Amino acid sequence: RIELTEEGQLFLGYAREALNQLAQGEEALKLLHCAPSGKLRVDAASPFVFHQLAPHLKAFNQAYPDIKLEITSHDNIIDLLEHKTDIAIRIGELADSNLHARTLGVSKLQLVASPDYLKTAPPLNELTDLASHQLIGFTDAPHLNHWPLTTPLDLKFSISASSGETVRQLCIQGHGITLLSEFMINEDLKAGRLVKVLEGEVLSPNRREKVHAVYYQNSGVSSRVLAFLDF
């Protein structure tokens, strides 16, 4: 990755602002005569796309037929301008002060396992019992392996994956216990593919629960972005 000099960083800031001003001017002209239209690029982690966005996209397309959606999936935080992204859905704490954010909601974390795993697993009555169990973690997001438990533990993971959706599938297939957001596993819990374990042992609220939509900070917001956020 190319690193900019101090002069380059300064120029980049002005260039970004100039592009934003041009985009705002174009948007203002569009708003005078027509409904929201054009390309809207939305980025979110794969599990959020599968379980939260996808079920609503058909209705959004019917409501705004002139908006062309482009959905991308990154499980790690991306630079919106670098990836030409209009909106990113982020779960957990926000750090980028150059972004506007709208809170979409809260998705609590749950410790879960498959019934098949629990049939042959050691007893699981308290948090310290986790030491004798297989745990499923994340490879590319170490902070997700620090579970916000009522009693802090040094957890050892038997298997890890880079994608939250892969972690979910590993859990369903009986590879161990994991900690996932409710939006990912609600249907699995209803269907009996997963069950909650050690209920009440996850701290709430915690820094990983909030779900935000973020977009680049400027003096105007495109009608496409507002249409998506308000839908």
Model-derived features: where do they sit?
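C-terminal regulatory
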Residues: 94-212
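Short, well-ordered beta-strand segments
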Residues: 39-43, 88, 136, 178, ...
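Conserved hydrophobic/aromatic "anchor" residues
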Residues: 11, 60, 228-231
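A late-sequence structural motif
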Residues: 199-231
